[in-house]
Amino acid sequence: MSISSDEAKEKQLVEKAELRLAIADSPQKFETNLQTFLPPLLLKLASPHASVRTAVFSALKNLISRINTLPQVQLPVRALIVQAKEPNLAAQQDSTNVRLYSLLLASKGIDRLSLQDRQQLLPLVVSNISCLTGTVAARMFHILLKLILEWVAPQESSHEQEEFVQFLQLDNDGFSFLMRQFTRFFLLVPSKQVQVSQQPLSRGYTCPGLSLTDVAFFTYDAGVTFNKEQLNKFKKAIFQFVCRGMAATQTIEQSPRMIELMEFLCVVSTDSTNLSDDAAQFMKRFPMPYENEEFITFLQTLYIGNTANGRPPVKAILQEKILSILNRSHFATTKAECISLICSIGLHSSEYKLRSLTLSFIRHVAKLNYKNLNPASSSPSSTDFSTCIVSLIRNNLHAEGWPKLQLGPQTPAFNTAILQRQLQYETLGDILKRDFELVSDLSYIEFLFESLKNDLPQFRSSIQESLLSLVGHLSILPQQSKLKLKNLLRKNLSIDEQQREDNNDAVNSIMALKFVSIKFTNAAFPFHDPEARLFNIWGTVRTNRFDIIEESFKGLQPFWFRVNNASINTSATVKTSDLLGSHLSETEFPPFREFLQVLIDQLDSEAASITRKSLNNAVRFSKQCLISNAIYGKKTMVIQDEDWSVRIDKALELDDTVVSRVNEMVQGMNDDIFIRYLTLLSNEFTATNSKGEQIAIFPYQDPIFGSVLLTLLNFVSNNVLRRLEILVPDLYHLVIMKFQSLSDNDLAVCATIIGIISTAIADSTHVKRITKIAQSQTMAETYVASYVVPRLYLKDQTNHIESDSILNLLNILTTHLSHPGTNKDMILKLVCQVTKFGLLLQVSAQERKDFLKKVMDTIQDKLINDVTAIQTWSYLSLYSTDLENSSLFQEKLLETNVSKQNDFLFSVGESLSVVAGKWSSKYLIKQIDIPNFNVEIMQQKFPATNVTTILDEIFSGCDSTKPSLRKASCIWLLSYIQYLGHLPEVSSKCNDIHLRFMRFLADRDEFIQDSAARGLSLVYEIGGSDLKESMVKGLLKSFTESTAGSASTSATGISGSVSEETELFEPGVLNTGDGSISTYKDILNLASEVGDPALVYKFMSLAKSSALWSSRKGIAFGLGAIMSKSSLEELLLKDQQTAKKLIPKLYRYRFDPFQAVSRSMTDIWNTLIPESSLTISLYFNDILDELLCGMANKEWRVREASTSALLQLIQSQPQEKFSEKMLKIWTMAFRTMDDIKDSVREVGTKFTTVLAKILARSIDVEKGVNPTKSKEILDNILPFLWGPHGLNSDAEEVRNFALTTLIDLVKHSPGAIKPFTPKLIYDFITLFSSIEPQVINYLALNAANYNIDANVIDTQRKNGVTNSPLFQTIEKLINNSDDCMMEEIINVVIKASRKSVGLPSKVASSLVIIILVKRYSIEMKPYSGKLLKVCLTMFEDRNESVNIAFAISMGYLFKVSALDKCIKYSEKLITKYFEPTSTENNKKVVGTAIDSILNYAKSEFDNVASVFMPLIFIACNDEDKDLETLYNKIWTEASSSGAGTVKLYLPEILNVLCVNIKSNDFSIRKTCAKSVIQLCGGINDSIPYPQIVKLFDISREALSGRSWDGKEHIVAALVSLTEKFSQTVADNNDLQESINHVMYTEVSRKSMKYVKKILPLYARYINVNPQEETITFLIEKAKEMIRLLGSESDDSEGSIKQTSDESTIKRIKPNTEITQKSSKENIENEEYVINLLKVSVDICNNSKSRYPMNLLEFIIDEIAYLFHNDRIIHTWRTQLAASEIGISIVGRFSTISSADFIQNVGRLWDQTFPINCNKETIENVKLQMIKFGGLIIQKIPSLQNNIEENLRLLNSIDSTSRIELELKNIGL
């Protein structure tokens, strides 16, 4: 077959390329050829001709073999990658092979590249990587992995990191592609198949989270496989590359890149390597995007997997991570399909944690988006999903063991299992709570009840909570379910826990079951359901837990039942009034008959035990049902509020409506159930029958049975009573057999019941037996007879009673009464029974009279304190017509007023009503307990006779001044009107009664007030319309008019006139120590004795307050009672004047500090004013005026109430209403803050706080307030706040509050306050000193007295200013101000700094200057001069802290000052330092100022450095150590190089020295001299000659004149100069002569003290240039000085001795040689001489011409003098110095020949050795002497023998190892 020309051509090209590559004979050539030919060769793989492609493949095979053998050869990697991305081919050519082989060889080449080269390839590889497809993309991605494998991450948050991100140039598509693949790579797991090298790669395996295609991308398509180690290496590299490279700079929340990064980190955070921790930490840097759709969808997809592309769900650990995120996402609850799959996967998982998280997720969805758990909203494929979930959870619970958890091998750890099961129960509850359909068939409720009963205790609370969450559904259950629920609850509540007492857990489970059951009962069934109420009654069994009992009683109390049910109503919005129960409505009770039927049926059933145990509460509830049924829909006192229980208990005693309604109802009852019920009550009451058999079924005693039975018998028909005859034997048997053991109450109840039944069966044998009374019968029989016979008489049934039986009964009673051993109280009660029903009318008048007398005689003395005796006495009075002295009855009763017991007095009141009204008294009428009795019969027999008489007596008691009688009379009057008010004799006197009660309202005794108030309401009820009107008006008048009227007897007169004898206080109320104040006269006397007539008014005010106004409860009670029933609204509408007076006062009284008063007033307000807010709005101005007026009242209670009321008022009304009176309000507010009374001040503070907030709101321009209006308000208020009522007030509290208010205004309303900035800054600065506590000021002034450093206190005071909120406020003001205010602000700051007195204000001024400089640096320039001047002026302040503060401010000011100003004030600072009057403080301040300038204005400092640096240099040598430290610090910071800086500023330094070294201030001279010395150390010969001469001139001139303390420093300076510039001095004869002359002059001075100091300096000077005459002069002066040294001390010692002789007062220690030797003075003299001699030795050693032998002799003579004189006693110092001087003298020469010199040295040895060779001499001295001897032996042989002999002698005297060693060293 012929070959086409194209094919041949191409083939030829391939062969040529192959040949070129093959003939390359070195690796370098091979590499070069590869760079050229390899990419084009690979392009030929796209040839359409198979032969060409085959040739290329063949060539490649050879090439690759050769490349493999040459590892150093580099491949053209970049060209290959470019070619792989965009091969240079024709459009129709297939580029696949070209790309793949290019990448294959590129991948090989990468391994050979350096790290740097690899990094350079990264941008190329990642660019457009997202556009590549299939295998090419896979291989390119693998190349990227290889490139980043050894990539070195840049430093975190560094510039390099940012540069790297820029370098990558990654677009959004590329970023997304890489992040997607990197994330998937972390899901990759190694293949389990072992890969053999020859075997082709496997393509078919999946990983959790990755499909076949995904896995193939990383392995098959890329042509690689990974083992675990390689995989981990790549993962690590990827993580580094992503987090510290590619995505390092992602900071924008919710951006796509950030979301992709978070997806990546989520996956990595569960990786099996330690990268998971790093990823978790890295994630914390960013907020989790819980609500980002893309992010959440990605996680859901990972969790669920994808069936469409075959991607399985991820591993469980990652699923757990995903769920923990979904559990916090709202968006995750919005996709129903995803939710169903997530829950299904999680609940079917074998992983415990995943199951738990799934349960949490279900709860999360149920809470936020329940409908998505609901099948209706799910897709058709997941129908019934919600049901499916709960079924799944229930199945799981069954699988784990149900109803009790079973632990088996499959169960996780115990704690884990417990937690998960708890979560399952809670999740079940969450779902059921939201899905009524699941609850309606009760199957889950049954399931949970069973679990609660039987599962482990650990789950109890979870199950209970789940059950209780369902109560909202129960009321809407279908009827069938409700019946089922009722059976379930009946079963739960009737469980007898006592059978399982041994198992505590079981008992607790039953209790939990019962608690939930009671909750269900209350929620599911209406209140009128008798069975449900019976369940509640079962819950009250006393063996139940307290919470069950409490919940059960709530189900039996209609108020709490309503409140409870309102709170569990989940379906509708519930009113707050219903939740609080404040809106009262009437709840219907179960019908009485139905309830009885249910109760009796239960008692007859098999499970009767629970009913029996709760029978007492069943009976109690049955009584409540009866009453409630009877009065349903009627107005009575039984209101269903929280006190309903008390109301219903007392209703039959107090409310006639209730009695009549119940009577009607009970009269119609005659059925068997009712009789059965009454029999049951009787059986429970008697407990045993007449045969002694037990008939009670309730296990305990309870008086309720007897009490209810008696109550019912009061109303039943005669027919019923006759049917109850069978009860009489048992009841009679109870009294007879248990007479001694029964309580009085039970006896009375039992006898009364027998008495009532007897009236219907008078002819029965039982009654006949009881009424047949014999003298000999027992007390028990008498007891019953006493109850039965009088009732039979009432019913006119006595014809069956034998005539003597009644007489026998009376005789028995009188006999027992007179017998000492009997129970008198019981007998008297029987006498009451016999007498009150008129039985005595059955016997003859004489017999009656005898009986009455006997009883009266017995009880007459007991009346004062015995209630029974009092009652008996009143009943005896019924027969008073039979006695001569009938008035005795009332007299005896009236005498009981002395009693202090209120209850007793009420009993007397009841008795008085009987004495006065007989059977007309309501009290007596209520005693009738026989059904349907006509009381008029008795009223005819016992007509009322002396009603008026006794009423007049009571009036008289009311008007009495005797307190006890008044109190008793008040109570009696109340009883009188209560029980006899219906009689015309009483109602005709209503005016008088009303007046008495009005007066009692003013009584101090709260009980009397309450009684009087109640009395007023009763009077009001019985009065006519005219009376009612006048009463209301009178009360209002008394309430609104404060003036005390004259005495009045009309209905309106409350207060009487006060005369001298009017008793305002009970004795002892105002005890002063001298007796008590009882009358007006006493008050006058006391006031005049104190000398303050004004006290009279104070006491009068107190009296008024005590009587009426301070105890308004009385009037409030009265008002409340009257007003609740009167049409006061009409009255107020008609009478505007009254309304205007009453409403403001009443408003104020609502806030009275006394709770009782405020409570009563609030009641009145609520009663009187239906529309409170409307009324307040209408009468706002009147109320405001009343309150402002009240705030200034002299009575503290009025002030406090007014303030509290105003506080409430201004908070509830718009500001516009009171804006005009704002100043007045503020004034009064501040006045209350300074009140004398604590409580008023407290309320005042609250009030002003609220005012401040209102003010802040009203001026807040930022919140939209009109700026003009805001300014107008502030124009009014601010002058007030900073005026005499505010900041300048005398009261500290007011000042502080005004300040706080201003600070708050600045803080919260900066815009509004801006125009007032300058004034406020001035006020605030000056205020600093005022608000500083006085104690600190005192302490600062008296610091020395307390040993405290005043500077320390001042520092604290300064810190206090800086940290003060006030200063921060100033700062805020400045920050908010404008440039245009600058001049004004600066002027006020200058003014404040000048006018301020205290330290804090001055310091504040300086700090404000600093703030101004910082904030307005440019604007400040024109004012810098003024401010610098202020600073300089403030340097003169007496307080150092103030000086320092302004010095620091000066530093800041330099920053904004012009150069001329800087120079001017720099020079002023220099002048200030060198002033002759300058103190250390001044110098310190100057130093601080310079330091501040250096720190805060560096460039300005540099401009004036030539002014400052000389001063700093000189001041570094100040005598004061602190100053020296300060200036040294400044010098160090200011000078770039020490010596260089000195040279730089030397001319200026010399100028300053020249001017100041002759200063009048010697300390400055001294400082200058020290500076010269320091200069010598800092300069050298290179400085100009004129400057050297100038230095000498300065020093010489300074020495002219007399000697002064410190002049020696100038001498030292001159000597230092001479030493430094010795050559200059030697070359200049004139200079040398002049210095010689000056030195000679100074040494020749007469002041020996001065000469002593400069003599060593003179010796140093001679040492520079020794001359014979100067040496001779030195010897002369030195000798003279040494001889003088001891003489001073001799003189002083002489004087001491003399004193000692003259006086024996103080003993002086004897001045022995030892004490003198160690004295300071001796040591100083000795050291001085030694120093002088050593300097002299230096002169000898430095002599350049002839050796000064005379000086040597002088030295040796003086050493001898030191050893042997008695003025300076030598010590070891001289001994040591002698040897050292010897060593120095001998050691200078190598050989010594001078005989004089040798002689002198010998003399020195001879002087030294004898002194030093003692045993006592210290070792160091001896060692030094041995060295000296060794030198002599070495240099002067002629003295050798003598020396050696001496040294051997020394060794023999005191031989030590060190001495022996030293001797050995010198050859001995």
Curated annotation (Swiss-Prot):
Positions carrying N-acetylserine: S2
PTM-bearing positions, type Phosphoserine: S1692
Start and stop residues of the HEAT repeats: 32-69, 116-153, 256-292, 313-351, 384-422, 439-476, 590-627, 707-745, 748-780, 781-818, 846-885, 945-982, 988-1025, 1030-1067, 1137-1174, 1178-1215, 1272-1311, 1361-1398, 1422-1459, 1503-1540, 1544-1581, 1649-1687, 1746-1785, 1830-1867
GO terms under cellular component: cytoplasm; nucleus; proteasome complex
GO terms of biological process kind: ERAD pathway; proteasome assembly
Record carries keyword Repeat: yes
Domain of life: Eukaryota
Location(s) in or outside the cell: Cytoplasm; Nucleus
Record's keyword terms, sorted: Acetylation, Cytoplasm, Nucleus, Phosphoprotein, Proteasome, Repeat
Pfam families: ECM29_N (PF13001), HEAT_ECM29 (PF24492)
GO MF entries: ATPase inhibitor activity; molecular adaptor activity
Functional description taken from the UniProt entry: Stabilizes the proteasome holoenzyme, probably by tethering the 20S proteolytic core particle and the 19S regulatory particle. The proteasome is a multicatalytic proteinase complex which is characterized by its ability to cleave peptides with Arg, Phe, Tyr, Leu, and Glu adjacent to the leaving group at neutral or slightly basic pH. The proteasome has an ATP-dependent proteolytic activity.
Protein family per UniProt: Belongs to the ECM29 family.
Note: Present with 2950 molecules/cell in log phase SD medium.
Subunit structure: Component of the proteasome. ECM29 binds to both proteasome 19S and 20S particles.
Protein's name according to its UniProt entry: Proteasome component ECM29
Gene of this entry: ECM29
